[in-house]
Each structure stands twice: as C-alpha cells, then as structure tokens.
Amino acid sequence: TGEKPFTCKECGKGFTQKRNLASHMTIHTGEKPFSCTECGKGFTQKRNLASHLTIHTGEKPFPCTECGKGFTQKSNLVSHMKIHTGEKPFTCTECGKEFAHKHRLLGHLKIHTGEKPFSCTECGKHFAHKYHLVSHMKIHTREKPFTCTECGEHFANKVSLLGHLKMHKGEKPFTCTECGNSFTQVSSLVSHMKIH
C-alpha cells in the first residue's frame, strides 16, 4: 500500500518498519553502534560496516562487465562504468563543459568563481584545489618523492617527472606555430615564444 506509519520526529522521513526507523535515528544521534574489529572505525549502519570490511579483506565483489576491474562498493562500480559509456550527466552552466562526476564539476566551477579556499601556511599563496596545495608545499619542504627510473633525478610532483621523461623518450609534443621548433615541455615553448 506504500503506507509509512513510522515517522522520524527529527526530519519527518517515513518508514514502513519500526526497525528501519531505529536504524535511521543513528543519523541524528551520531551513534555508531557497528565497529570494525580490524581498525575500530564506527558506523551508523550494519551495511556500511559490511562494505567497509572489504578494505581489509581485499574482496572486490563488484566486477566491471566491460574490463573486469573489481570494486569494493557498488557505487564505485557505477561511477567507473561512466568511463565505458561516456556518460557525462553533469554540465557547467557557465561554459557548457560536461563531466562524468559531480565532484569534477564542482572542482571545475572554481575556474569561473575564482574561488581558492586552500592557502599555503608558509607563503600565503592560494589554490583552488587541495592537491595543488599539497604539490606546492613540497617546494617548502624540499620533498621530491617522484624519481626518474632512467637517470635517478628526483621531482616534487608527478607532472614534472612526466615532463622530464619526455626528454629521455625524445618526445617533443609542444610545437611553435611561428617557426616549427618543438619542445619537451610547455614551459620551454612559452619561453621560446618570447623571441618572436
């Protein structure tokens, strides 16, 4: 009949069974009665604990039918499937660019808003994305965790390493439209363009 006689007094959501209401109430109380025996992390719902346990067991019960890659959670599989379908349901209202995932759209929107909520505690420079701040911080710590397997040179970030690897491979993907000279890195092309 679709009747939901058990109503949450906090938010008004209705449930068909009393036990479902009791389970729902943990959202409001903050109670986490289901604990992981491996790491102690608490969960409001039993199903969330069951899903979490696959991290420790290494079990990946949700395989992709296209490429065979396994996932611990169904939601991750659903998200992954967009790679194969090409589905991009999230559209930027400013420029029309489409995204497969909502978090990618939200990150992109910062280009239009100019929002840079992540600031460096060392020099005060602001960044739109946390991963850019993390990468930037390596300048101050002088940390260079990315190593070239060809020559052993170390780099602060993956982008710099990948740019460097083009030198070993002889790749020069950045070409000057004025004279045809090619460069391994875009920064070299930008410097070169100043002579024209």
Curated annotation (Swiss-Prot):
Alphabetically ordered keywords of this record: DNA-binding, Metal-binding, Nucleus, Repeat, Transcription, Transcription regulation, Zinc, Zinc-finger
Chief site of localization: nucleus
One of the record's GO cellular component terms: nucleus
InterPro entries the UniProt entry points to: Znf_C2H2_sf, Znf_C2H2_type
Signal peptide: none
Transcription regulation among keywords: yes
GO terms assigned for molecular function: DNA-binding transcription factor activity, RNA polymerase II-specific; RNA polymerase II cis-regulatory region sequence-specific DNA binding; zinc ion binding
Zn-finger (C2H2-type) residues: 6-28, 34-56, 62-84, 90-112, 118-140, 146-168, 174-196
Subcellular location: Nucleus
Keyword Flavoprotein: no
Top-level division of the source organism's lineage: Eukaryota
Protein family: Belongs to the krueppel C2H2-type zinc-finger protein family.
Function: May be involved in transcriptional regulation.
Protein name, UniProt field: Gastrula zinc finger protein XlCGF8.2DB
